[in-house]
Curated annotation (Swiss-Prot):
Subcellular localization(s) per the UniProt record: Secreted, Extracellular space, Apoplast
GO process terms (BP): response to chitin; response to oomycetes
Name of the protein this chain belongs to: Lectin-like protein At3g16530
Keywords, ordered alphabetically: Apoplast, Glycoprotein, Lectin, Secreted, Signal
InterPro entries: ConA-like_dom_sf (IPR013320), L-lectin (IPR016363), Legume_lectin_dom (IPR001220), Leguminous_Lectin (IPR050258)
Keyword Secreted assigned: yes
Similarity annotation: Belongs to the leguminous lectin family.
Chain spans, region Legume-lectin like: 20-270
Conditions for induction: By oligogalacturonides and chitin (e.g. chito-octamer and crab-shell chitin CSC). Accumulates upon Hyaloperonospora arabidopsidis infection, during both early and late stages of infection.
Organism of this sequence: Arabidopsis thaliana (Mouse-ear cress)
Gene Ontology, cellular component aspect: apoplast; cytosol; nucleus
Amino acid sequence: MQIHKLCFLVLFLANAAFAVKFNFDSFDGSNLLFLGDAELGPSSDGVSRSGALSMTRDENPFSHGQGLYINQIPFKPSNTSSPFSFETSFTFSITPRTKPNSGQGFAFIITPEADNSGASDGGYLGILNKTNDGKPENHILAIEFDTFQNKEFLDISGNHVGVNINSMTSLVAEKAGYWVQTRVGKRKVWSFKDVNLSSGERFKAWVEFRNKDSTITVTLAPENVKKPKRALIEAPRVLNEVLLQNMYAGFAGSMGRAVERHDIWSWSFENAAKNN
């Protein structure tokens, strides 16, 4: 009995050492790594972006960058084990600076390296490039919020959300929007509401991974709307071979010929290492 208690305590303490939790209501730069053109949004650019994390700069053609949490985050007890459950949420806005076109979008990313020196702009979203796109050794998860239809990546539209594994071609993609449940008589009915990602409005996204069934879900809604009970995307069994023991998490974004701003206004993250 005592041995069982001791084993449980050792396991609990070991898992607690892996636990990570943070919540940024705004950013001051002290807990972030800025790669490429990523920066804290200046208050002097006419769109009141002070305190936002931005991946691109208007003055730089084909701008791209990454903003990552300063420390690596444990996603597995070891490289050969199953991933911890985790959940993250963030508010963002995408604002076109040239009309009528927008592009290209941004993504929440989990990546093994804090290095975007080989990343490309345009449809590669500042994450990958033509040479390494699609390679399993990338070990990259990207939840993309895409505002330009790149046919070479089989994009379903110029306004969609996708789950990408080691590639800019989405494993699963859905048009941008959210589900609303209403009561019609005695029945509950789901209806879908479209949103325009590049409207300049603020949206909130939730990304959750469940260890018990290896499923990742993505949920989206306008900032002032309560989290929908139905996810926009549900992708099963995609992360076991992708995630490594320690990785970086954050955001990447890029522009093509059209100029748009990608601003992250708040961000929270928690892994469930202490509960595994």
